[in-house]
C-alpha cells in the first residue's frame, strides 16, 4: 500500500511540474507578443547580416509567409493602413545588404506584409539614403559622356505606396542624378486613400533639393492615365518613367540621356536589378539580356547572344546598348516631343498591363528603337503578388488591354493571341474600339507585324507561314489518328525529299483539317514537358501525355524550316550529352535524367532535328539518334517515368514513331 502511495505521489508531482512549465512558457509568449507590439525598433541591437556565401546566385533571406485557411493575423484596421511605421536604423540595409527583422517582430512583420505585398517592417528599418554599391562594369565606370545632355522630368506614379519605399525612390533619384540634368520630379497620385500620402507627403516634398510637384487623379484610373497626366505637366526635354518602388544606383541617368541625345527616336531602358520583397536586399542582374513576349503576351527576360546594335550597326563595345524586341514598361526614358509624335500611350488602356506590349510594337514598327543600356542600373522591388484591386477585376482589365494591342499591331497574329490566351476569344477584337489607334498606325506609316518578327526578333518562337505550329503526337499504331497519319505519309510521292522540313510542312498542311478531326484527346498522346511545375526556361525532361485542348500551350510546338523545335517562352527541344554536372543538377531537382531536354533556345546544332516522313522518325541532325519513348527510373523518387531519349534509330521500333497535328493560328 505504501509503495502504491509513493508512485501516486511522484505522478502527482510530475503533473504539477508540467502544468507549471506550460503556464511559464505561455506567460513568456504573451510578454514577447506585447513587447513586439509596443516596443520600438530604435533600441534593438543592429543585427549582423548573414555571412556571404559562394554561389552562382546571390544569397536571399527567405521569409515564410502563412498560407492556409483562416486569418491568424486578424483583420487589418483603418489605423493599420494609415500608420507610418518608418523608424530607420543607421546602417541598416547598407550597400544593398538584406535586413534581418528581429524574432520578436516576426508576427508583426507577417501581419503588415499584406499591406503592400512586401516586407514593410524591413523597408521601414532602412534609411532613405541607404548606400548602394556601384553596380556598373569597369568599362561603364570609365565611360565619358558628352556635355550638353538634355534635362529630364522623372515621373513616378503611386497608389497607396508605403512611405519608406516611395521616399527612398525619390531620394535615390535626387542623390544619384547630376543636379543640372534633373529638371524636376513629378509625383502622380492615383487616388490613394492613405492619410500619410496627403498633407504629410506635400509638406515633405516642399523642402527637397529638386523641384517636386504632386498631381492627384480624381478617381482610380490606373497607370496609363496617371502617366499621361504627369507627362502633360512635364517641363524636361526627356520623360523618365519610374515605378514607385525603385532605387537608382550610381551613374544611372547619364547613359539614358546620352543615348537619347544621339538619337531622339530611341526608347532607352536601364538594366533592372532586383530588390527582394522579403528582405530588401539589392541584387545586381547580368547586363547581357533582352526582353520579349510569350504566346500570352506576358513579358519575359532572355539571356542574350544577340549582337549589340546602335542605330542598326553591330558593335563590340560592351557599353553600347542592346536592342530589345520588348520592354518591361515600368522603367524607361523617351524624348518628350517624340513621345507625343508616336502617340504617347493608348489612353483607353486601364490600370496596367499590356501598355508595354503596345508601346514596344508601336515604337519598332513605326521607325523607332527600343534598347537596354548596360551602364544604367535601377533596382526594382519584385513582388510575387499585387496588393492592388480595381473595379472589374485585374484579369478582365489585362485581357481587354491585350486585345487592344493585338488588334492594332499584330495583323494575322492577333488571332493566334486570342485563340490561345486564357480569357480571350476571337470575339474580343469586336469588343474594343481601336479606331483612333488604327488611324495612328496609318498616319505614321508603320510596318507590318511580319516585318517586326523577321527583322527585330528573328529568333522568335511564334508561328509563321513557313513554320509548323501544332502538336507532336506519338504514333503508337493503335489510335485512329496514328493509323491515318502513318498511312498518309507512307503513300506520299517523292519521298526522297522526306528529310526536308519544308516538304513535311507542305504535306501536313494539305491534310490539316483531316488530321485535326482525327485526334482523340482521351487516347492520343502528345509530346510535352515531364513536369508541369518546372519553369519553362530551365532544364526539363520530355515525355508524352494526354493531348490537351487547343487553349492550352503545354503540348504545342513551333518547328522552323531549319529544324528547331520550339515552344512557348523560348524553350527548345535540345540534345544534351550526359555530362556529370547536368546529371547531378537534375537529380537535385528530383528530375529524371535524359539526353533530350527542353532548354532555352540557342543558335547551335544541339537543337536542330530532321524528320523522315517515310519512317515517321525524328532524329538529331548531328548524332543521327532518334527520339525514343522509354521508361526510366527516377532513383530519388523511386518511381518509373516515361521519358523521351535519343537512341539508335530502328525504323521498326514503335516507340520512335512521331507525327504532327497542325493547329489553326490565323484566319
UniProtKB/Swiss-Prot annotation:
It is found in: Golgi apparatus membrane. Residues 513-661 form the Ricin B-type lectin domain. Signal peptide: none annotated. InterPro entries: GalNAc-T (IPR045885), Glyco_trans_2-like (IPR001173), Nucleotide-diphossugar_trans (IPR029044), Ricin_B-like_lectins (IPR035992), Ricin_B_lectin (IPR000772). Disulfide bonds join 140-375, 366-446, 526-547, 572-601, 626-649. GO terms for biological process: cell-substrate adhesion; extracellular matrix constituent secretion; O-glycan processing; protein O-linked glycosylation; regulation of cell adhesion mediated by integrin. It is a single-pass type II membrane protein. Mn(2+) binds at residues 243, 245, 380. Disruption phenotype: Mutant larval wing disks show a decrease in thickness and in the content of O-glycoproteins specifically along the basal surface of the columnar epithelial cells. Adult mutants display blistered wings. Mutant larval shows down-regulation of synaptic O-linked glycosylation, integrin level and signaling via Ten-m and if. Synapses show smaller synaptic boutons, expanded activity-dependent postsynaptic pockets which affect synaptic plasticity and synaptic strength in both the pre-synaptic and post-synaptic assembly, no differences in neuromuscular junction morphology. Residues 149-259 are annotated as: Catalytic subdomain A. The chain crosses the membrane at residues 13-35. Its EC number is 2.4.1.41. It catalyses: L-seryl-[protein] + UDP-N-acetyl-alpha-D-galactosamine = a 3-O-[N-acetyl-alpha-D-galactosaminyl]-L-seryl-[protein] + UDP + H(+); L-threonyl-[protein] + UDP-N-acetyl-alpha-D-galactosamine = a 3-O-[N-acetyl-alpha-D-galactosaminyl]-L-threonyl-[protein] + UDP + H(+). Keywords: Disulfide bond, Glycoprotein, Glycosyltransferase, Golgi apparatus, Lectin, Manganese, Membrane, Metal-binding, Signal-anchor, Transferase, Transmembrane, Transmembrane helix. This is Polypeptide N-acetylgalactosaminyltransferase 3. It comes from Drosophila melanogaster (Fruit fly).
Amino acid at each position: 500500500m505504501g509503495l502504491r502511495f509513493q508512485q501516486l505521489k511522484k505522478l502527482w508531482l510530475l503533473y504539477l511540474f508540467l502544468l507549471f512549465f506550460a503556464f511559464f512558457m505561455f506567460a513568456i509568449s504573451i510578454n514577447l507578443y506585447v513587447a513586439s507590439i509596443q516596443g520600438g525598433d530604435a533600441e534593438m541591437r543592429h543585427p549582423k547580416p548573414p555571412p556571404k556565401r559562394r554561389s552562382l546566385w546571390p544569397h536571399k533571406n527567405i521569409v515564410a509567409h502563412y498560407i492556409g485557411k483562416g486569418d491568424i493575423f486578424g483583420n487589418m484596421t483603418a489605423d493599420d493602413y494609415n500608420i507610418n511605421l518608418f523608424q530607420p536604423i543607421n546602417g541598416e540595409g547598407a550597400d544593398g545588404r538584406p535586413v534581418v527583422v528581429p524574432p520578436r517582430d516576426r508576427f508583426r512583420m507577417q501581419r503588415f506584409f499584406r499591406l503592400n505585398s512586401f516586407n514593410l517592417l524591413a523597408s521601414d528599418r532602412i534609411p532613405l539614403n541607404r548606400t548602394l554599391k556601384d553596380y556598373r562594369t569597369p568599362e561603364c565606370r570609365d565611360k565619358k559622356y558628352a556635355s550638353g545632355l538634355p534635362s529630364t522630368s522623372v515621373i513616378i506614379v503611386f497608389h497607396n505606396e508605403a512611405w519608406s519605399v516611395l521616399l527612398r525612390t525619390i531620394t535615390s533619384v535626387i542623390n544619384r542624378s547630376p543636379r543640372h540634368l534633373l529638371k524636376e520630379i513629378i509625383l502622380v497620385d492615383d487616388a490613394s486613400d492613405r492619410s500619410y500620402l496627403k498633407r504629410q507627403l506635400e509638406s515633405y516634398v516642399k523642402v527637397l533639393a529638386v523641384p517636386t510637384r504632386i498631381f492627384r487623379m480624381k478617381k482610380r484610373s490606373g497607370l496609363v492615365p496617371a502617366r499621361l497626366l504627369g507627362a502633360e505637366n512635364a517641363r524636361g526635354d526627356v520623360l523618365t518613367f519610374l515605378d514607385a518602388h525603385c532605387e537608382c544606383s550610381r551613374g544611372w541617368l547619364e547613359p539614358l540621356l546620352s543615348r537619347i541625345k544621339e538619337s531622339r527616336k530611341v526608347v532607352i531602358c536601364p538594366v533592372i536589378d532586383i530588390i527582394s520583397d522579403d528582405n530588401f536586399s539589392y541584387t545586381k542582374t547580368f547586363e547581357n539580356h533582352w526582353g520579349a513576349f510569350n504566346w500570352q503576351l506576358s513579358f519575359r527576360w532572355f539571356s542574350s547572344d544577340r549582337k549589340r546594335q546602335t542605330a542598326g550597326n553591330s558593335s563590340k563595345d560592351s557599353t553600347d546598348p542592346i536592342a530589345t524586341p520588348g520592354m518591361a514598361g515600368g522603367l524607361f526614358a523617351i524624348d518628350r516631343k517624340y513621345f507625343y509624335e508616336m502617340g504617347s500611350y493608348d489612353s483607353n488602356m486601364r490600370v496596367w498591363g499590356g501598355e508595354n506590349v503596345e508601346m514596344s510594337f508601336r515604337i519598332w514598327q513605326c521607325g523607332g528603337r527600343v534598347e537596354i543600356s548596360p551602364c544604367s542600373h535601377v533596382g526594382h522591388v519584385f513582388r510575387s503578388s499585387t496588393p492592388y484591386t480595381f473595379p472589374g477585376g485585374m484579369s478582365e482589365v489585362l485581357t481587354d488591354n491585350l486585345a487592344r494591342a493585338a488588334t492594332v499591331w499584330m495583323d494575322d497574329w492577333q488571332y493566334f493571341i486570342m485563340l490561345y490566351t486564357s480569357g480571350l476569344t476571337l470575339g474580343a477584337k469586336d469588343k474594343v474600339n481601336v479606331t483612333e489607334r488604327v488611324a495612328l498606325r496609318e498616319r505614321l506609316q508603320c510596318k507590318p507585324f511580319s516585318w517586326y518578327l523577321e527583322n527585330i526578333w528573328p529568333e522568335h518562337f511564334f508561328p509563321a507561314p513557313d513554320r509548323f505550329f501544332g502538336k507532336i503526337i506519338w504514333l503508337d499504331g493503335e489510335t485512329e489518328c496514328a493509323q491515318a497519319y502513318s498511312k498518309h505519309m507512307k503513300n506520299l510521292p517523292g519521298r526522297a525529299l522526306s528529310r526536308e522540313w519544308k516538304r513535311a510542312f507542305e504535306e501536313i498542311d494539305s491534310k490539316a483539317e483531316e488530321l485535326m478531326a482525327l485526334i482523340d484527346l482521351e487516347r492520343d498522346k502528345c509530346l510535352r514537358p515531364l513536369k508541369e511545375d518546372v519553369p519553362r526556361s530551365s532544364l526539363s525532361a520530355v515525355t508524352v501525355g494526354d493531348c490537351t485542348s487547343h487553349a492550352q500551350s503545354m503540348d504545342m510546338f513551333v518547328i522552323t524550316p531549319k529544324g528547331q523545335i520550339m515552344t512557348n517562352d523560348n524553350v527548345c527541344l535540345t540534345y544534351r550529352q550526359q555530362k556529370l554536372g547536368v546529371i547531378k543538377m537534375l537529380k537535385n531537382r528530383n528530375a529524371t535524367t535524359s539526353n533530350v531536354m527542353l532548354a532555352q533556345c540557342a543558335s547551335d546544332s544541339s537543337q536542330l532535328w530532321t524528320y523522315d516522313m517515310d519512317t515517321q522518325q525524328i532524329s538529331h541532325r548531328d548524332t543521327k539518334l532518334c527520339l525514343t519513348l522509354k521508361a526510366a527510373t527516377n532513383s530519388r523518387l523511386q518511381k518509373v517515368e516515361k521519358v523521351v531519349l535519343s537512341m539508335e534509330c530502328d525504323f521498326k521500333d514503335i516507340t520512335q514513331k512521331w507525327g504532327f497535328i497542325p493547329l489553326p493560328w490565323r484566319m
